Amino acid sequence: MIYITIFMILPCPVPCSHVFLYVFYIFLFLVLFIMTIYQSSQKLHFSNCYHNNQHHNSLHN
Protein backbone atom coordinates (compact mmCIF):
# COMPACT_ATOMS: atom_id res chain seq x y z
CA MET A 1 0.00 0.00 0.00
CA ILE A 2 2.96 2.30 0.60
CA TYR A 3 4.04 2.02 -3.02
CA ILE A 4 0.64 3.14 -4.27
CA THR A 5 0.70 6.30 -2.16
CA ILE A 6 4.26 7.06 -3.25
CA PHE A 7 3.30 6.69 -6.91
CA MET A 8 0.21 8.83 -6.38
CA ILE A 9 2.21 11.58 -4.68
CA LEU A 10 5.03 11.54 -7.22
CA PRO A 11 4.29 13.84 -10.14
CA CYS A 12 5.20 12.58 -13.58
CA PRO A 13 8.54 13.99 -14.79
CA VAL A 14 7.21 13.87 -18.33
CA PRO A 15 3.61 14.34 -19.46
CA CYS A 16 2.33 10.77 -19.16
CA SER A 17 -0.51 9.55 -21.27
CA HIS A 18 -3.61 8.59 -19.34
CA VAL A 19 -3.58 5.14 -20.90
CA PHE A 20 -0.13 4.38 -19.55
CA LEU A 21 -1.10 5.45 -16.03
CA TYR A 22 -4.33 3.48 -16.28
CA VAL A 23 -2.54 0.28 -17.30
CA PHE A 24 0.17 0.87 -14.73
CA TYR A 25 -2.31 1.22 -11.86
CA ILE A 26 -4.28 -1.83 -12.98
CA PHE A 27 -1.07 -3.85 -13.06
CA LEU A 28 -0.08 -2.59 -9.62
CA PHE A 29 -3.45 -3.48 -8.10
CA LEU A 30 -3.40 -6.89 -9.76
CA VAL A 31 -0.01 -7.68 -8.25
CA LEU A 32 -1.15 -6.59 -4.79
CA PHE A 33 -4.37 -8.54 -5.18
CA ILE A 34 -2.53 -11.72 -6.16
CA MET A 35 -0.06 -11.29 -3.30
CA THR A 36 -2.83 -10.92 -0.72
CA ILE A 37 -4.66 -13.98 -2.05
CA TYR A 38 -1.41 -15.95 -2.05
CA GLN A 39 -0.63 -14.96 1.55
CA SER A 40 -4.12 -15.78 2.80
CA SER A 41 -4.06 -19.16 1.04
CA GLN A 42 -0.67 -19.89 2.61
CA LYS A 43 -2.08 -19.09 6.04
CA LEU A 44 -5.11 -21.29 5.40
CA HIS A 45 -2.91 -24.11 4.21
CA PHE A 46 -0.67 -23.77 7.24
CA SER A 47 -3.56 -23.81 9.70
CA ASN A 48 -5.03 -26.89 8.00
CA CYS A 49 -1.72 -28.73 8.27
CA TYR A 50 -1.43 -27.76 11.91
CA HIS A 51 -4.97 -28.88 12.63
CA ASN A 52 -4.48 -32.23 10.90
CA ASN A 53 -1.23 -32.76 12.74
CA GLN A 54 -2.86 -32.13 16.12
CA HIS A 55 -5.65 -34.51 15.23
CA HIS A 56 -3.15 -37.14 14.16
CA ASN A 57 -1.21 -36.82 17.41
CA SER A 58 -4.31 -37.11 19.56
CA LEU A 59 -5.31 -40.30 17.73
CA HIS A 60 -1.95 -41.89 18.47
CA ASN A 61 -1.98 -40.86 22.10
UniProtKB/Swiss-Prot annotation:
Record localization: Cell inner membrane
Annotated membrane topology: Single-pass membrane protein
Induction summary: Expressed approximately equally in exponential and stationary phases (at protein level).
GO cellular component: plasma membrane
Keywords from the named record: Cell inner membrane, Cell membrane, Membrane, Transmembrane, Transmembrane helix
Chief localization: membrane
Parts of the chain that traverse the membrane: 18-38
One Pfam family linked to the record: YncO
Protein name from the UniProt record: Protein YncO
Organism name: Escherichia coli (strain K12)
Origin organism lineage: Bacteria, Pseudomonadati, Pseudomonadota, Gammaproteobacteria, Enterobacterales
